[in-house]
Amino acid sequence: MSIEVETLKKKDIDSYINFIDEIFGYKAIKEVVEKQIRKNKILVIKQNEEVVASITLEERFEYIKNQKYYYISYLGVKKEYRRKGYASKLFKKVEELVKENDIKYLELTSGNQRRTAHYFYKDKQFKIKDTMVFVKFYN
């Protein structure tokens, strides 16, 4: 079983929506995902035409430092495919895109409770930037 990373295509949106719901508990809206495909890089790994792993890269610009960077979100792998190199394969593709697009750094946020993910990020040479996230919600 080969592990191939590809960009999410319109024909795979329904599978991706099911994946997001299963992994993150969010019911993504098809029209929003279609917009995100045009705006961001959504990389997926499929098995039997089903999305089983994914990462989203949002290109941002740090105007004070005059640097482009990727903000990483929605990195996930279905439970039965974990610890088999899927997330590492996604990150290998991310590293290729970093070089191709003159990206200066990667950034992501991760909840304190996600210790397994933290080990993975540290293994990928991410450094912890001591920050707190503040959120204000509006109805």
What would you call each of these model-derived segments?
Residues R60-E62, E80, Q113, N139:
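Short coil/turn motifs at secondary-structure junctions
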